[in-house]
Design a protein with these regions (language model features):
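Membrane-embedded catalytic cores of phosphoryl/pyrophosphoryl-handling enzymes
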Residues: 15, 60-150
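Transmembrane alpha-helix/helix-exit interface in multi-pass inner-membrane proteins
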Residues: 30-48
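Membrane-interface interhelical connector segments
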Residues: 45-59
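Interfacial segments of alpha-helical transmembrane regions
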Residues: 6-36
């Protein structure tokens, strides 16, 4: 969490009002991906891997919500997609962000909370939410912050 707060403060300091809207759109990407992923869970009632006795021993707590899709994957891929598009001039950044989101998502498989398909579904939802948030940010930027160097 401190990483995200420090990053947000750096964006605010560097880009001022445009940075504030960037943060608003990033938060919107997370909210949309999280809610969309939660919505899908109500239709696909897949139990978590930790619901079986063999896996339950690997995690301290097995959530009572359904498994497909992974909210962790959706949220982190939403941020990765959004920031990759916003800072597309930084050529190495998308690789770092996708690897970071991938590690977060795969950790959910490692601890027995999700199946690989759960994180793939979450990643898809997240990338779509990230693109949608970027489209909104682009409209706001073009209308109000055309001179900004983002």
């Amino acid at each position: 969490m401190p990483f995200y707060i420090i990053g947000g403060l750096m964006v605010l300091y560097r880009y001022r009002w445009a940075g504030l809207w960037m943060i608003v759109c990033a938060v919107l990407a997370i909210v949309v991906s999280d809610q969309s992923s939660g919505f899908v869970k109500h239709f696909i009632h897949r139990l978590r891997p930790c619901a079986t006795e063999q896996v339950r021993l690997l995690v301290a707590h097995c959530s009572d919500t359904f498994s497909f899709t992974s909210n962790h994957a959706a949220n982190h891929f939403a941020i990765a997609a959004f920031l990759s598009l916003v800072f597309r001039r930084v050529k190495w950044l998308p690789y770092v962000l996708i690897i970071w989101a991938g590690f977060v998502a795969l950790s959910q498989v490692y601890v027995g909370l999700h199946f690989p398909a759960d994180i793939a579904g979450g990643a898809l939802i997240g990338v779509l939410a990230g693109y949608a948030a970027f489209a909104l940010f682009k409209l706001i930027k073009e209308k109000y912050f055309a001179e900004s160097n983002i």
